[in-house]
């Protein structure tokens, strides 16, 4: 489904005769893809398991390179961007979230204590619906993650980890938002919460929801 919402800061995405074949495989996973997501649009993509949806996401994130054709962001081929500059355009939320054994605040800001905006971190945790739990921790947002790895560290449930990753996406404010089956392992209540957060998170951005 499509919802058009052209806003400043959003980017356009074009798949131009794009294909991808995994090394050692004779059969392409994706072949001759041609479609455009206009700046500010919100696209939902559905398909059977094994149809290549996650491969498409990895291509768009720059983790894989197309074996044919190209992908353009705002008319510019992904390969023509500096890596750091390109990664700055994307916020992503995946099904299997890997949190770092750092503090909650550092996970949200993707940075060190010296360059983070602590007020923004807390606001993003509130938007993601996680602050109420974190506020009960003695060290609040300074609590370390990685229970069993660090002293006084805590563990988060699958749903809570998804919320933390969403807070990270809120914090980054990248113009392109990608969610790859973020609700696949969640119960119906947590799934509904993710959809509600997605609406907030995708405001003013181009977004792709798998």
Language model features by range: what are they?
Residues 1-4:
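Transmembrane helical bundles of ABC transporter permease domains
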Residues 6-210:
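ABC-type nucleotide-binding domain
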């Amino acid at each position: 489904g499509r919802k058009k919402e052209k806003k400043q800061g959003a980017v356009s995405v074009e798949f131009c005769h794009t294909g991808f074949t995994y090394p050692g495989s004779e059969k392409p996973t994706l072949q001759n893809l041609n479609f455009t997501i206009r700046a500010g649009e919100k696209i939902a993509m559905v398909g059977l398991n094994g149809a290549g949806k996650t491969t498409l996401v990895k291509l768009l994130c720059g983790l894989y390179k197309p074996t044919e054709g190209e992908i353009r962001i705002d008319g510019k081929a992904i390969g023509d961007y500096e890596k750091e500059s390109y990664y700055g355009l994307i916020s992503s939320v995946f099904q299997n979230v890997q949190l770092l054994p750092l503090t909650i605040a550092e996970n949200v800001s993707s940075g060190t204590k010296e360059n983070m905006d602590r007020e923004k971190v807390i606001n993003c945790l509130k938007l993601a619906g996680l602050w109420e739990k974190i506020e009960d921790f003695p060290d609040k947002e300074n609590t370390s993650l990685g229970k069993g790895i660090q002293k006084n560290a805590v563990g988060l449930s699958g749903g809570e980890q998804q919320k933390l990753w969403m807070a990270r996406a809120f914090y980054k404010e990248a113009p392109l938002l990608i969610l790859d089956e973020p609700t696949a392992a969640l119960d119906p209540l947590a799934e509904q919460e993710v959809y509600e957060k997605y609406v907030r998170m995708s405001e003013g951005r181009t977004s792709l929801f798998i």
